[in-house]
Amino acid sequence: MSTLLFDRLTAAALFPLLIGALPAIADPSDHPESDTEQEIVVLGTRETAGDPTLSSGPVTERMSQSSRSIERDLLIAAGAYRLGDALELVSGVSSQNNRGGMLDNFAIRGFLGTPDGGAEYYVDGFLANRGMAPPRDPATVERIELLKGPAGALFGDVDPGGRVNIVSKTPKFDPAASATFTYGSFDTRRVELDATAPLSSTLAARLVVAAEDSDGWRDTVSLKRRTVAPSLTWEPHAGLRFTYIGEITRFDAPFDRGVPALNGDANAVPRSNFYGEPGDGITRFRNQRHQLTALADVGGDWSLNGGVAWRTGSLRGFSSDQSRLVGNALWRQRRSRDFVVDDLSARIELAGRIGAHRVSIGAKGYLLDYAERWMRVNPSAANSYAIDVLNPVYGAVPPVLRPFTDNHEKRWSGTLYAQDMWEATDRLTLTGGVRYDAYRQQIRNNRTGAIGRTIDDPVQFRLAGRYKVADAIALHAAWGESFVLNSGTDRFGTGFAPETAKGYELGASGAWRGIDVAVTWFDIRKRGILTNDPTDSNFLAPIGSLRAHGIEFDGSLKLDSRWQLVANYAWTHARADDDAFATDRVLNVPHHSGSIFALGRFLDADARGFSLSAGLAYMGDRAGAIDGSGLVLPAYVKAKAAVEYALSRQVSLRAEADNLFDAHYAQSSYSPMWIFPGAPRTLRFSLRITS
């Protein structure tokens, strides 16, 4: 593809910057009717209407029957202080390596993100962790969408496994404020403040602030994080709305690689043991997001929505990471990290109706600038930099670091996409989509001067159908393909080909008053997925191909206004097909997993009373390594429970326990040396005040 065409496509994708000209064409007297056909299953109670500039659209909500939206009230009731806590409420999700505690990482339907960068996730429809991003703070979250399968499109982006989209809180024109104060185990202190109000008849503002400090349950591993999220909504008239959302995050903690396995036992050493060096200090993660979206009614049943998001971040710090076990001496590798990311994204989409067709056409693009500089020194018999695995004593003199990796990556990507949902009959709905991507990727090795370039323009397609057997029962089928660019280089300094995928799903769903159930069979194949190199785990390597197929069940039950039950189960058979790896099993992906969560509310007419909740999560045996060790992370069951008492509409008290029975388990693993243990029993007590 010519450079000129590429530049034109990128410019087209950045067209939302011109959306400020829309008032001239927006007619306030002729705006679209609200969509009453939303069918995505809502877990919890949706308190605010979906914003089409931030979340999945009506086509995805109608056609992706295996998708779920987890609302804020259920996130609070379930004690979801981390993204992984929330994803336990949906089938087919498992925890992955958290990169020293510095990121959110998970697998969906057996497919994982890179061990270093983590699984991709979106915030308000924009990819939010391209390159890197710190763990999400729950204070800013309105809802979390898990969009599964080829029909789970988000502004043209599709993954046959699934995508996570976190929808942010936005301003309201009705004044409201809340403050939550939490104290818990390990001297954890947390404060959340949230206030929103109109500034005029057309302008509203919101400010969310969160601060958390904890001594942590791992020896010498503390945590400090701060989040400030201002937002503004401007509605000059009924047919036009602009929303700005900002987010500034600071995340400070020692880099923590967890614990090693002893004699093949992932739970052999005390889970509180820290094998780094307190003298390394903290690793500092800084992240800023600034986002502007707009929605305009352009007449009839047509609307135009678009936005631009700019994100910058940095991660810097030192660590002493487990490398090799010789007797009781745990050799360590000394490292430093200096990562910087600058990511600019934009999109625009025109959507509307033509008879029985719901059509959308969009353009999007991004510019990524990502630099990674590592220094390290490997241990040796002469200088093992060791620590006793059974009785760690700190204070070893760190070896002098040497240059290791110094890469600078740049990407330019432009996308055009279109989709059509055709209501063929009152029972049959069909949809199809096409996506054209044009990209350039350049990775420069600053140590050697070598430059790797990739230019391509792939096209992907997807198809889906839904048939209503009865008013309450529907069958669905979907097929689609996708691709994702990979970052980084292998042990030879060579960049990676993109990750590509094809997959289908078949399923049935039922929706009766207070009951939602869905059963789905999926079969997906991907190529080019990155995992740790079996020859040298300090580097990444692509898996030739990976296939995952399985069955998922998701169900929710609401009994009057008091009781709600959410349950899920997944059987996932994920296998790699690459002779370079000693095993065909996939890291941290269980055959069987599931959870159940129950919530009961008992409030009087003045909103006084109490709420009870309890849940169980099961995770089956998982591969803990892909080398020849055969390490297996044992299955576990984890319980949680909470009680909340509302003294009035404005004041409530809450006590909760996570890992109620203090199960000792391995949460995830990167290798036999880097296993992250699950947290012990954790108690939290909260006071919430609202106005």
Task: For every predicted segment, state its role.
Residues 117, 130, 140-142, 153-230, ...:
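Outer-membrane beta-barrel translocator/receptor signature
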Residues 212, 216, 229-235, 239-297, ...:
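Acidic/polar loop-and-plug regions of large Gram-negative outer-membrane beta-barrel proteins
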Residues 36-174, 506:
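Acidic, small-polar-rich N-terminal luminal/periplasmic segments of exported/outer-membrane proteins
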Residues 235-237, 356-368, 407-526, 558, ...:
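Structural signature of Gram-negative outer-membrane beta-barrels, strongest in the C-terminal barrel
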Residues 346, 350-353, 425-430, 523, ...:
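Gram-negative outer-membrane beta-barrel transporters
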